[in-house]
Amino acid sequence: NVVGTYNILEHCVQSGIKMVYISTDAVFDGSMGFYQADDPMSPVSKYAKSKTAAELMVRTYENSLIIRTSFFGETFPYDKAFVDQWTSKDYIDIMAPKIFSKINSNKKGISHVSSNRRSLYELALIRKKDVTPCHIRDYDYGFELPKDLSLKQE
């Protein structure tokens, strides 16, 4: 996430073109929910830390747009989903038009592209009816899973 982003950023700066960086809701630790663009980042996973580092680099270029978002493909990819993890992610066919609209705007800085806040389990049931509910406490990923990564809609 960092090296590739640096290479693209360098090209954008040299060419004088706008840099659009797709980031993630995971730059937050999930302790609060309804995160706003100016809330302090506090990543917990290795992936989130790399996205945070790349974001900090992109912020140095004034002609840039950082879009924080999160989405699944067209279906929910797992057999189980957390009932106690909150999100504002959605499916790609819902999020893509919102993302493209933001990219095509004149907006610069940091922007959140999100959907309604709901549990991961509720989101899963929209496209997959045979999902088993589960709890965060039942799994060990080597770090504390974020409980609420919902983003405030803009």
Sequence positions of predicted segments:
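Active-site Tyr-X1-5-Lys
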Residues: 14, 42-70
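Short-chain dehydrogenase/reductase
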Residues: 36-52, 85-93, 118
